[in-house]
Amino acid sequence: MEIRFTTEKPTLVNNLTIVDGLTRSGKFFLGKIISGLNNIEFFQYSFTLDYLPYMARLGAITEDGAISLLRAVVDQNCYDRSIGRNLNLRFDDRSSIYNSPVFDKYILRSKSEYDRKKIVEFLSDKDQIFLFVLHNNLANANIMFNAFPSLRIIHLLRNPVDLVYSWMKKDYGKIKLNSKIDLFGIGIDPAICGRNGPLPWYVYPIKSEYESIKNQTDRIIASIQIIIDLCRKTFKSLSIDYQKQIMFLNYEHLVENTNEAIDDISEFLGTHRSKFMNEIIVKENCPNVIEVEQRTKKRNKILSEATNKYCEILETLENKYVENSNFF
């Protein structure tokens, strides 16, 4: 007997927004900025919301099961936050509630009695925005919109030279994993099977090519290229209405023209700045100037380590980004 999970069950949360982008694009920085707008709960990170969409895409879980679980995870996480449960209190985590100017509000919730009816009303309030920061979610946005039709996504873009260099600094793309520390370094998220060990899910379209790459920097460039390609194809496959629910934002614009970027975000989300926004901007050292000379040094370092084929791929990606301010 076939069992299906319902995808019609109503959710508690009615106003969900996701900050998305490639790894090292500055999403948590953006999450802190957006959390300074009115009627927005300080952002959360959920590894389950990161994993489920691509596992459904690759057939590891049925779509109805994934949708049902995605909705349950959002509702549970937001419910827990509303009563002060499972708060991230680690000081040096970017998603720690101590990064919120009203962190005491969240701590107070954990000490207070709560009225279930009022909690449900709060979660269901269409003017109350609940914010999550995720990775590479645009690549699987179709299932996210199936789960949350009113979802809004703010996808953060960044110069690919900065991305590649940052991945190099993090030692991503290792050819051999010689220890559990190496394994942890590539992330503990569910990986697909490769000939010689686990591989990141997003390389599945180029799995054979990726495994044949013996240069770590080449692997990083190939990874970033395929993620961008997956995001682009998924975006173009969405209906016009869903495309309008996605905002593209450049990291460089956010850093250098912070107030203008905040105004654009506010309009997209239908809210406005809280009284804490100026404090947050100052704390994040914005607005600031991105030094072109530093990017030149990064580019030279990358080009000195990558092979010609992947140097050309990076050059193509960067030229498109500089000319169009996006990859789409």
Task: Report each predicted region and the residues it spans.
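PAPS-dependent sulfation machinery
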Residues: Y45-F132, C193-I206
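PAPS/PAP-binding and catalytic site of the sulfotransferase fold
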Residues: G26-N39, M144-F148, W167-M168, F248-R273
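Walker A (P-loop) phosphate-binding motif
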Residues: T7-S35
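Short beta-strand segments
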Residues: G21, L131-V133, H155, F248-Y251
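Long, charge-dense
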Residues: K174-V203
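PAPS-dependent sulfotransferases, especially Golgi type II membrane carbohydrate sulfotransferases
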Residues: M1-I18, R195-F328
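Conserved phosphate-donor/acceptor-positioning beta-strand/loop module used by diverse small-molecule
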Residues: V133-N136, M144-K170
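Short aromatic-enriched loop/helix-cap "lid" or pocket-rim segments at secondary-structure transitions
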Residues: P53-R57, S166-K169, I175-K176, A261-I262
